[in-house]
Amino acid sequence: MSKDTAIFAGGCFWCMVEPFDKMPGIISVRSGYTGGFVENPTYEQVCSHTTGHTEAVKIVFDPEIISYAELVNIYWRQTDPTDAMGQFQDRGDSYRPVIFVHDEEQRKIAEESKKALAESGEFDKPIVTQIEDAKPFYEAEEYHQDFYKKNPERYALEEMGGREQFRNQHWN
């Protein structure tokens, strides 16, 4: 089995796991922190907006079953790509939308996809999601992992914080 890795930040990582986790070819989806300057930060440190980290998900996938381009398309459908200061009810730099790329091929796919989205006319504001080189990824505490399975009621409330409505308005 081939393995590749994708890292996406799209607001609260609790809401970014399920859409990928249920797809064929996904080996694992882990919540964590990346993009900052503090080694092995805690949730509390990241929430203080002093570490430079963004909440993100690290996806290990089989590229023979699901492509990186398909993952990028799933990513867009979970986020508001016009909001640089967070996602939905989650505000601040630790919730900013970012596609973290591991190599030039991923960068090319992400940039082409972003350009196509900008030209699609779906949004009347600029697409501000950043595309950045992947940095060390630190897994979040265990209670954050698979949150949608462990805490379905709370997860449903998080989804109702604007994400679900936005998806229905722009993607369905």
UniProtKB/Swiss-Prot annotation:
Substrates-to-products reaction catalysed: L-methionyl-[protein] + [thioredoxin]-disulfide + H2O = L-methionyl-(S)-S-oxide-[protein] + [thioredoxin]-dithiol; [thioredoxin]-disulfide + L-methionine + H2O = L-methionine (S)-S-oxide + [thioredoxin]-dithiol
Annotated keywords: Oxidoreductase
EC class: oxidoreductase
Keyword Oxidoreductase assigned: yes
Gene Ontology biological process: protein modification process
Organism: Ligilactobacillus salivarius (strain UCC118) (Lactobacillus salivarius)
A Pfam family recorded for this sequence: PMSR
Family assignment from sequence similarity: Belongs to the MsrA Met sulfoxide reductase family.
Active-site residues annotated for this sequence: C12
Job description of the protein: Has an important function as a repair enzyme for proteins that have been inactivated by oxidation. Catalyzes the reversible oxidation-reduction of methionine sulfoxide in proteins to methionine.
Stated name of the protein: Peptide methionine sulfoxide reductase MsrA
EC assignment: 1.8.4.11
Name of encoding gene: msrA
